[in-house]
């Protein structure tokens, strides 16, 4: 797979909003000898959830450049005859395999979608409110009260694509990585004899007998890459995904004078970006051996092996010398690591519960004077009640006031200096204070 630069987007921000729960219904049966027909208001439907799903057919985040807002469907309101409102449809957003999902505000990593079909919930829908059928008691047989649905979650997300490749080719620009990937795979990258020809990661599929694996040409690595020189910090994150690092070194001496120094410079940049990269299996690929004499080559190979303590495979991407050995070695290592990974237990996706806050029974109340004769009751847990119920419903007001009175509302009003005839507001509901 060859990705054109114009289509390659690997970092975006999007906004997701889950659906709100539908409101419960106030309704009564039309039935003879039953007080007011008996309550039969149905519950509201749950709001739709928002999920991100790793889809192998999606290769970049380009689709999110022009569309950044994603909203799931709200739940429908409850109806009479105890009919529950329909749940809102869940929204599935397809992203490339290898996408890391972060909370854009906190930076917290929410999920790593590194397997095809892997799903993560990024916003939970609100639970539907209960209808008045739930509020009937032996003493309150015709309740005029129902709950509002909970609001669905919303958040800004940062999506960061880290390319999924089995082998990452790293090294200085112009050491022959693009030529090498075109020699061993089906990739056809742009190749020229000057630095930074490759400005996006090129991916190629390598076939070896009945086994295939993906190789990525990681561009932009030079001294200072971890700090952004040569776009290196942009591309180093793609190395994190690879099972194996193939460190390509130019041993010809024509453009790079000291292959050993080159090796350690790139390793240092990888370390600065993430020490974890140095723990990955690595082989050294000594390229351009066709441009150097056999005796001189042996000296350089010995220096590299002694200095790096790595297996060094001499190749020529131009003539093909050593390519078969290189592919065989890469396939062997990748195959072994894939078998090890496949033996790990896979996570099973379980859809979480919708947003539902338990109604608090205890409050820390505060009475605030907003104007002469006008007061507002505030409280840490009061917001849940205000959002859950329509205080224009008489029974909802009475239920809330009973709970507030148990928490000392009357005493708080007197202590604050509220006088008879003053207006007190709780949420959107206002009442005149009477002693």
Swiss-Prot record:
OCT domain boundaries: 357-435
User: InterPro entries under this entry?
Assistant: G_OBG, GTP-bd, GTP-bd_Obg/CgtA, GTP-bd_prot_GTP1/OBG_C_sf, GTP1-OBG_CS, GTP1_OBG_dom, GTP1_OBG_dom_sf, OBG_GTPase
Question: Which molecular function terms from Gene Ontology are attached?
Answer: GTP binding; GTPase activity; magnesium ion binding
The Obg domain is annotated at 6-164
Query: Mind telling me which Pfam families this protein's record contains?
Result: DUF1967 (PF09269), GTP1_OBG (PF01018), MMR_HSR1 (PF01926)
Q: Where's it found, cell-wise?
A: Cytoplasm
One of this protein's GO BP terms? ribosome biogenesis
Residue positions binding Mg(2+): 178, 198
**Top EC class for this record:** hydrolase
Annotated EC:
3.6.5.-
Q: List, for all copies, the residue spans of the domain called OBG-type G.
A: 165-335
- Extract one GO cellular component term from the record: cytoplasm
What binding partners and quaternary form does the record give?
A: Monomer.
- Xref: NCBIfam families: Obg_CgtA (TIGR02729), Obg_CgtA_exten (TIGR03595), PRK12296.1 (NF008954), PRK12297.1 (NF008955), PRK12299.1 (NF008956), small_GTP (TIGR00231)
Entry's family note: Belongs to the TRAFAC class OBG-HflX-like GTPase superfamily. OBG GTPase family.
State what protein this is by name.
GTPase Obg
Tell me what organism the protein belongs to. Thermotoga sp. (strain RQ2)
């Amino acid at each position: 797979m060859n990705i054109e630069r114009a289509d390659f987007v690997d970092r975006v921000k999007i906004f997701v909003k889950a659906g709100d729960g539908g409101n419960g219904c106030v309704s009564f049966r039309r039935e003879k000898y039953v007080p007011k027909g008996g309550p039969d208001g149905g519950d509201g439907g749950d709001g739709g959830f928002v999920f991100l799903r790793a889809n192998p057919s999606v290769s970049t985040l380009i689709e999110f450049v022009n569309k950044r807002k994603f909203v799931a469907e709200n739940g429908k309101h409850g109806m009479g005859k105890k009919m529950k409102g329909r749940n809102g449809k869940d929204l599935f957003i397809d992203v490339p395999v290898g996408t890391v999902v972060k909370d854009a505000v906190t930076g917290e990593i929410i999920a790593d979608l590194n397997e095809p079909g892997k799903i993560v919930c990024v916003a939970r829908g609100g639970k539907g409110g209960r209808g008045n059928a739930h509020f009937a008691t032996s003493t309150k047989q015709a309740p005029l009260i129902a709950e509002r649905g909970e609001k669905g979650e919303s958040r800004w997300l940062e999506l960061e694509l880290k390319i999924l490749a089995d082998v990452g080719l790293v090294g200085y620009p112009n050491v022959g990585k693009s030529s090498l990937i075109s020699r061993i795979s089906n990739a056809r990258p742009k190749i020229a004899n000057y630095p930074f020809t490759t400005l996006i990661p090129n991916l190629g599929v390598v076939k070896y007998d009945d086994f295939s694996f993906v190789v990525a040409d990681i561009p932009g690595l030079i001294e200072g890459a971890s700090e952004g020189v040569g776009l290196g910090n942009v591309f180093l994150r793609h190395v994190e995904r690879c099972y194996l690092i193939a460190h390509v070194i130019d041993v010809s001496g024509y453009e790079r004078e000291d292959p050993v120094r080159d090796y350690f410079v790139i390793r240092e940049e990888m370390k600065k970006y993430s020490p974890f990269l140095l723990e990955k299996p690595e082989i050294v690929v000594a390229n351009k051996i066709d441009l150097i004499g056999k005796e001189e080559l042996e000296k350089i190979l010995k220096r590299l092996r002694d200095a790096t303590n790595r297996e060094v495979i001499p190749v020529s991407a131009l003539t093909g010398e050593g390519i078969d050995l290189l592919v065989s070695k890469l396939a062997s290592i990748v195959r072994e690591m894939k078998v090890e990974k496949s033996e790990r237990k896979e996570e099973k996706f379980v859809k979480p519960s919708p947003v539902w806050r338990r109604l608090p029974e205890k409050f820390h109340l505060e009475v605030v004077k907003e104007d002469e004769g006008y007061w507002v009751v505030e409280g840490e847990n009061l917001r849940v009640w205000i959002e859950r119920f329509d205080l224009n419903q008489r029974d909802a007001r009475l239920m809330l006031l009973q709970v507030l009175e148990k928490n000392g509302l009357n005493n708080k009003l007197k202590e604050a200096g509220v006088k008879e005839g003053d207006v007190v507001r709780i949420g959107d509901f206002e009442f005149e204070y009477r002693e």
